[in-house]
């Protein structure tokens, strides 16, 4: 009898120990997963690159210009690899009209882009903010039977060590393609 009672006590102790160890294991793995999820942060560049324009193309000229500004801000304000630069360049070209893309070879476009980015970084300018025309300020018109839109965007540039910003207003012209997507046809500095 004594031996059977001892065996029961040993079994109960082993089961309790297994439950305690199992609960400890569960808690230690649970908090590790939460910490991993919290520590993964998406950079501004990665966030911009994750947008799938084939499935979720911006529906209005203003939204197209907003996404263009987000990419442009990444070019001048963020750190990125050479591969990410190429991906950003490809992503921004998805917003361009075919006619604009046809003006330069891909190689020339990338070289000009790299030169422009290097110059801005050398001059120590970043894009502090940007302001896009209100939707009510978009001027719609037709040219050669195609719908177009004209709107303005002001980039507020900040020089390192400076407290103020310099405004650079640009006028954009967008044209609707055969799929109903607004594409950037061109832009130029606007008179302020």
Predicted region positions:
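A mature extracytoplasmic/lumenal domain signature
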Residues: 107, 134-136, 153-157, 172, ...
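Short beta-strand edge/turn micro-motifs at domain boundaries
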Residues: 33-43, 150, 164-192
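Short low-complexity stretches enriched in small and charged residues
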Residues: 21-27, 45-49, 102-110, 126-131, ...
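Core segments of small alpha/beta cavity-forming domains
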Residues: 43-122
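Surface-exposed, charged secondary-structure patches
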Residues: 114-158
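Short, charged low-complexity linear motifs
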Residues: 9-10, 90, 94-95, 169
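Amphipathic, hydrophobic N-terminal targeting peptides for secretion and organelle import
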Residues: 1-46
């Amino acid at each position: 009898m004594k031996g059977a009672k001892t065996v029961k006590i040993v079994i109960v102790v082993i089961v309790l120990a297994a439950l305690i160890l199992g609960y400890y294991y569960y808690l230690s793995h649970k908090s590790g997963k939460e910490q991993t999820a919290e520590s993964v942060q998406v950079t501004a560049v990665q966030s911009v690159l994750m947008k799938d324009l084939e499935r979720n193309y911006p529906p209005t000229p203003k939204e197209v210009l907003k996404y263009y500004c987000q990419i442009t801000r990444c070019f001048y304000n963020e750190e990125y690899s050479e591969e990410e630069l190429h991906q950003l360049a490809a992503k921004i070209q998805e917003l361009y009209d075919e006619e604009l893309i046809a003006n330069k070879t891909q190689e020339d476009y990338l070289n000009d882009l790299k030169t422009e980015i290097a110059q801005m970084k050398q001059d120590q300018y970043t894009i502090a903010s940007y302001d896009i025309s209100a939707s009510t300020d978009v001027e719609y018109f037709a040219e050669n039977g195609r719908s177009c839109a004209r709107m303005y965007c002001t980039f507020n540039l900040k020089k390192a060590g400076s407290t103020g910003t310099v405004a650079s207003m640009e006028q954009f012209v967008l044209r609707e393609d055969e799929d109903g997507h607004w594409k950037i046809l061109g832009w130029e500095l606007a008179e302020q």
